Design a protein with these regions (language model features):
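Condensing-enzyme catalytic core mediating Claisen C-C bond formation in acyl metabolism
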Residues: 3-7, 30-35, 218-295, 304, ...
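Acyl-CoA/ACP chain-elongation machinery
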Residues: 186-232, 265-279, 309-316, 333-383
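Beta-strand segments within the central parallel beta-sheet cores of soluble alpha/beta enzyme folds
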Residues: 5, 95-104, 162-166, 187-195, ...
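Short pre-catalytic strand/loop immediately N-terminal to key active-site residues, enriched for Gly-Thr
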Residues: 134-139, 159-166, 228-232, 334-345, ...
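A glycine- and small-aliphatic-rich helix-loop capping segment at beta-alpha/alpha-beta transitions
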Residues: 20-24, 111-128, 181-184, 204-217, ...
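Conserved beta-ketoacyl condensing-enzyme motif
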Residues: 6, 21-23, 27-165, 195-204, ...
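Active-site-proximal alpha-helical scaffold in enzymes
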Residues: 77-90, 144-148, 152-155, 161-196, ...
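Glycine-/small-residue-rich "gating" segment that lines the acyl/pantetheine channel
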Residues: 125-135, 176, 180, 196-253, ...
Length: 418
């Protein structure tokens, strides 16, 4: 099997646009959570959101025509890809574009456009839809695979073009799919990761209906509290995280900078319940074990874990239980943290952003903190790197995710060693 490495990254998040701003704020434990006065009229109990401020697509490289054509999620994905391709320093004139694929994932696709379009077309639900008034972009802007398509068009990448849609594990699953495509020799380069822009009334209402959103609104910066005893839900957010994956020889031949190596990937389903989780973490533990075995490492070699850490009561207990099943007493000695304490939960994009955190952690030998951790939960009693990040020599790191529908995924990344 061929080896697969990360050579480019792009980030659009509530704590920064671009890797430099993002990593600085991630290291320092800055919260990107805010209130959104324009949503007050809907009367939602949750009033804290991970909104990407100062996002100006026209200044980042999109034309006005492209902005009109693309939903916010696609703008995120395309511009984040621009960052990642530029960061990779890949010479597009010297590669075989038939050997380059795209898989940019999402959980809920173009809800912003559809929400706004429905309101306009029906006078806020008071009138029937007149087909003659519908935008010619309506279907394309709402398709789950539009972002992957737009990136393929933009760069003339002619390999696989597809979209994972596995909820909150979809970022890792997209990277895992890309890893498998390259490892097995189908492609040499993959653009992968995820984008999400779900802060819309319909999406917020859907999550409120099942009681998953945090109501710790005052102040909003402290609403996301993974593993803390006072947590009561996740903070809905938007973001994009895009990676350029390459076959190792392809990367070395062009002298690419290597952030890290994708070494193992595991994905399972508990086949039990749409939102329910077993508190012992048995199902997530299986995904972690698969990733560790595929990476050919031992549990003792894991230096850091970037946790799913959504901030819901049951998820954080389930995740803690999974670590204890996999690592036993060693679980108490492995530092771990939740990026969502700062960014909120951008659904499908979360685990893509968190895989990039692992790359930057490996490169900088630094583990970011879990902020807003002030009161210990007796059932969540591991080392969550509370409130202040730490330096540590990192060689092997783990990231994982869980999602509605009983999905669990895990990935091992290694520092590249020749």
């Amino acid at each position: 099997m061929r080896r697969v490495v990360v050579t480019g990254i792009g980030l659009i998040t509530p704590i920064g646009i671009g890797k430099e701003e993002f990593w600085k704020n991630n290291k320092e434990g800055k919260s990107g959570i805010c209130d959104m006065p324009e949503l007050e009229k809907f009367g939602f109990e949750s009033k804290a959101y991970g909104y990407v401020k100062n996002f100006k697509p026209e200044q980042l490289g999109l034309t006005l025509r492209e902005i009109r054509r693309m939903d916010r999620i696609t703008q995120f994905g395309v511009l984040c890809t621009d960052q990642a391709v530029k960061d990779s320093k890949i010479d597009l004139s010297k590669i075989d574009k038939n050997r380059v694929g795209v898989n940019i994932a999402n959980a809920v696709a173009g809800t912003k456009f559809m929400d706004e379009e429905f309101s306009v077309l029906t006078n806020n639900g008071k009138e029937v839809v007149n087909p003659e008034d519908i935008s010619p972009y309506a279907y394309a802007r709402s398709m789950p695979n539009t972002t992957s398509n737009e990136v393929s068009y933009r760069y003339d990448f002619n390999g696989t073009c597809c979209t994972m849609a596995t909820g909150c594990t979809t970022g890792i699953d997209s990277i895992g799919f890309a890893y498998d495509q390259i490892r097995c020799g189908e492609l040499d380069v993959m653009i992968c990761g995820a984008a999400e822009a779900p802060i819309t009334p319909i999406t917020i209402a859907a999550f409120e209906a099942i009681g998953t959103l945090s109501t710790n609104n005052n102040p909003p910066e402290k609403a996301s509290r993974p593993f803390d005893d006072t947590r009561n839900g996740f903070v809905l957010a938007e973001a994009a995280g895009i990676l350029v994956l390459e076959e190792l020889g392809h990367a070395l031949n062009r002298g690419a900078h290597i952030y890290g190596e994708i070494a193992g990937y595991g994905s399972v389903n508990n086949a039990m319940h749409m939102t329910g989780l077993k508190p012992d973490g048995e199902d997530l533990s299986r995904a972690i074990k698969i990733a560790i075995e595929e990476a050919n490492v031992t549990p003792f070699e894991i230096d850091y874990i970037n946790a799913h850490g959504s901030g819901t009561k049951q998820n954080d207990i389930n995740e803690t239980g999974a670590y204890k099943k996999v690592f036993g007493e060693l679980a108490y000695k492995i530092p771990m943290s939740s990026t969502k304490s700062m960014t909120g939960h951008p659904l499908g994009a979360a685990s893509a952003v968190e895989a990039i955190v692992c790359c930057l952690a490996l490169e900088n030998n630094f583990m970011p903190p879990t902020i807003n951790y002030n009161k210990k939960d007796a059932l969540c009693d591991l080392d969550y790197i509370p409130n202040c990040g730490r330096e540590k020599n990192l060689n092997v790191v783990l990231t994982n995710a869980s999602g509605f529908g009983g999905l669990h995924a895990a990935m091992i990344l290694k520092k590249y060693i020749d």
